[in-house]
């Protein structure tokens, strides 16, 4: 029988704090990056992921690309997402630092776990 996974949420933010009890504090969720010029360097971007499903450990990949173009980065995470017994939720975050954005436009972040995907979006705009 194949394991079943549901990606419950994904957020793009500037920082994540993990409390001693494992709770996450997600700081400054955003969907737009502004820059004076391109290419631009965004100092830090976190992708926070929450998933539920069958208990186990799962490989996670995160890809960032400008819509309609090749990926600017893809990470297969060295640490697997651990999903504990129901009703607990697996949580994981990925840090991209620095993130080079070559041009203004619409970008998508694709999160993949066991064939399940979730897309997040952000705009890069010139100010």
Where is each model-derived feature located?
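Contiguous segments within soluble domain cores/interaction surfaces
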Residues: 3-104, 108-127
């Amino acid at each position: 029988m194949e394991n079943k996974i549901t990606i419950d949420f994904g957020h793009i933010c500037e920082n994540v704090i993990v409390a001693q009890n494992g709770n996450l504090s997600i700081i400054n969720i955003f969907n737009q990056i502004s820059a004076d010029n391109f290419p631009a360097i965004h100092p830090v971007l976190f992708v926070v992921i929450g998933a539920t499903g069958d208990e186990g450990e799962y490989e996670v990949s995160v890809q960032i690309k400008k819509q309609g173009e090749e990926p600017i980065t893809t990470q297969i995470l060295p640490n697997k997402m651990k999903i504990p017994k129901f009703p607990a939720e697996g949580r994981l975050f990925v840090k991209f630092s620095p993130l080079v954005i070559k041009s203004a436009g619409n970008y998508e972040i694709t999160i993949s776990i066991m064939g399940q995907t979730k897309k997040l979006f952000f705009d890069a705009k010139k100010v």
